[in-house]
């Protein structure tokens, strides 16, 4: 135990962990909001993964939590399961979290099977195309919220989906009664009565869900970009642009304080205390998140089975993301990480986070670099980052719920710009034709088809 925990650098670990936790806070909120599960899910993921991946992992200075690639893939999985559940997030949630749990367990298994050492052999064009594709996805999907547009609040679009909404309600009534055996002629009156009792409010609620789902993802964002431009909410746009301006501008003044945090605090405070009319992020409950027992009881395997492959992809992506960051940490600290132990730690962190409703994550490069530069030296630094984020959940959930959605959209725009692999794009003219084709194919498939299959196709092409 003495070797496992080294308290001789505790002062430095505390400072490094707190600083990394501060950097992680706005990103966690933004990734949670982007995913579709709400800002709280990002915060829960950041806290649990940071603590447990550090406790059980194999990279002493690694700071883990939701990352851009993991969130982009999670967003696709969440949207797919919600759509399969006819837009009912309460029905979909146990299956979404079950996929996240499965991904974590796969990572643990990968660690025990000593597969961590082989991740580094993935060809660079595949990784480059995928990372740039992730950046493009984030940029495209954040255009509507930056403009203050939400398809689920577009009255004309909701009106358009009203007939379809009524059809879905009728389908559910018929399905329920077929299961109950109420399809004989004598009992058919009950079906007619239930159908005639459908209210306009019920139709409206169903149409809102349909409109909201139609605007999600890359294709949904592109489909309604014209409507977004015609219905710009100037307040949201100003808040997003001001956030972007501060993030890039404050870095020129000093890097001692994270510019993302400065933007979050300054713009959110100005909007709140200025009494501005802005759209809030989803509410963040104060107190410890509840354990989701529904993962064991609320699973429909017919709906979930197509997403099992997604769990493998999520596990593989998290492994790549984490171990690449581990290499960065090694170069900075002149140490050697343990790749298989790191996968076990990441898997445990993701599994526990999922049981409490958190987004999956991985080793985060920027947060890890900040931790090292701020003095972090041992696994205690990552655990301290997790403790800091837990304190935010316990004490400041209500305050964090006042953050404008436009601010998080602005933060995500800068994340999308930052995650793209410009080195790979600049090297394209000098690459061999085979590498160019692989990089561009993975990039296009990542953005417009399926993240789940993009890397697999790239690996097959590179073989």
Which residues fall in each region the model found?
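Transmembrane helical cores of multi-pass ion-transport proteins
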Residues: 1-463
């Amino acid at each position: 135990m003495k070797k496992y925990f080294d308290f001789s650098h505790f002062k430095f670990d505390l400072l490094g962990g707190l600083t990394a936790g501060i950097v992680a806070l706005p990103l966690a909120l933004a990734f949670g909001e982007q995913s579709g599960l709400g800002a709280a899910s990002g915060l829960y993921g950041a806290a649990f993964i940071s603590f447990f991946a550090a406790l059980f992992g194999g990279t002493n200075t690694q700071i883990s939590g939701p990352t851009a690639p993991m969130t982009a893939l999670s967003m696709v999985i969440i949207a797919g399961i919600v759509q399969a559940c006819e837009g009912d997030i309460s029905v979909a949630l146990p299956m979404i979290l079950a996929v996240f749990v499965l991904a974590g367990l796969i990572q643990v298994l990968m660690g025990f099977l000593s597969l961590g050492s082989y991740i580094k052999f993935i060809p660079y064009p595949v990784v480059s195309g995928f990372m740039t594709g992730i950046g493009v996805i984030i940029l495209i999907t954040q255009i509507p919220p930056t403009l203050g547009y939400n398809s689920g609040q577009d009255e004309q679009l909701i009106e358009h989906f009203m007939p379809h909404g009524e059809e879905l309600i009728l389908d559910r009534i018929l399905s329920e009664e077929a299961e109950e055996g109420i399809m004989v002629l004598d009992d058919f009156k009950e079906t007619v009565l239930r159908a005639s009792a459908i209210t306009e409010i019920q139709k409206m609620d169903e149409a809102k869900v349909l409109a909201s789902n139609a605007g999600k993802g890359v294709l949904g964002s592109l489909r309604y970009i014209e409507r977004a431009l015609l219905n710009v909410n100037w307040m949201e746009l100003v808040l997003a642009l001001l956030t972007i301006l501060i993030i890039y501008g404050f870095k020129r003044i000093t890097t001692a304080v994270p510019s993302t945090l400065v933007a979050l605090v300054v713009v959110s405070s100005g909007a709140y205390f200025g009494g501005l009319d802005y759209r809030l992020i989803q509410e963040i409950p104060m107190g410890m998140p509840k354990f989701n027992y529904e993962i064991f009881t609320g699973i429909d395997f017919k709906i979930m089975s197509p997403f099992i492959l997604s769990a493998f992809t999520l596990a593989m992506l998290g492994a790549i993301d984490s171990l690449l960051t581990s290499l960065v940490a090694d170069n900075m600290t002149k140490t050697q990480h343990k790749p298989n132990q790191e996968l076990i730690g990441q898997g445990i962190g993701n599994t526990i986070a999922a049981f409490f409703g958190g987004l999956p994550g991985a080793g985060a490069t920027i947060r890890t670099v900040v931790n090292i530069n701020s003095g972090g030296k041992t696994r205690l630094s990552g655990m301290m980052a997790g403790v800091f984020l837990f304190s935010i959940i316990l004490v400041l959930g209500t305050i964090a719920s006042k953050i404008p959605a436009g601010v998080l959209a602005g933060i995500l725009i800068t994340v999308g710009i930052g995650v793209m692999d410009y080195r790979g794009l600049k090297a394209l003219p000098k690459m061999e034709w085979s590498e160019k084709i692989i990089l561009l194919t993975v990039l296009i498939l990542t953005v417009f088809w399926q993240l789940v299959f993009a890397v697999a196709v790239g690996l097959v092409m590179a073989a």
